[in-house]
Amino acid sequence: MLIKVKTLTGKEIEIDIDPTDKIQRIKERVEEKEGIPPSQQRLIFGGKQMGDDKPASEYSIEGGSVLHLVLALRGGL
């Protein structure tokens, strides 16, 4: 099924996933297209951050769903 991942800049990335795919796999697909390491990605759907080890189906993600990508940048001195 096709879903979209929307970045903070408004860019939409189309990704083909299976409902059984874990969120980690979706992050890996985003990395393939955008070069953003999964460790720096936070995917939000329905106002909730999704855990890497859960399948897309657990969050009721369906074809046409739009996930929001937020970058988890680590700060430091």
UniProtKB/Swiss-Prot annotation:
* A GO cellular-component term linked to this record: SCF ubiquitin ligase complex
Q: Which GO terms describe its molecular function?
A: cullin family protein binding; protein tag activity; ubiquitin protein ligase binding
Listed InterPro entries: Nedd8-like (IPR038738), Ubiquitin-like_dom (IPR000626), Ubiquitin-like_domsf (IPR029071), Ubiquitin_CS (IPR019954), Ubiquitin_dom (IPR019956), Ubiquitin_ubiquitin-like (IPR050158)
Q: Region Disordered: start and end of each range? A: 30-57
Q: Does the keyword Nucleus apply?
A: yes
What the protein does?
Ubiquitin-like protein which plays an important role in cell cycle control. Attachment of nedd8 to cullins activates their associated E3 ubiquitin ligase activity, and thus promotes polyubiquitination and proteasomal degradation of cyclins and other regulatory proteins.
Outline the segment boundaries, as ranges, of region: Interaction with ube1c: 70-72
Q: Which GO terms describe its biological process?
A: cell population proliferation; modification-dependent protein catabolic process; protein neddylation; regulation of protein stability; regulation of proteolysis; regulation of ubiquitin-protein transferase activity
Could you say which residues are annotated as the site Interaction with ube1c? 8, 44
Question: Per the similarity annotation, which family is this?
Answer: Belongs to the ubiquitin family.
Q: Where in the cell is it found?
A: Nucleus
Query: Signal peptide location in the record?
Result: none
- Keywords for the protein's UniProt record, in alphabetical order: Isopeptide bond, Nucleus, Ubl conjugation pathway
Which lineage?
Answer: Eukaryota, Amoebozoa, Evosea, Eumycetozoa, Dictyostelia
What is this protein called in UniProt?
Answer: Ubiquitin-like protein NEDD8
Looking up SUPFAM superfamilies in the UniProt record yields: Ubiquitin-like
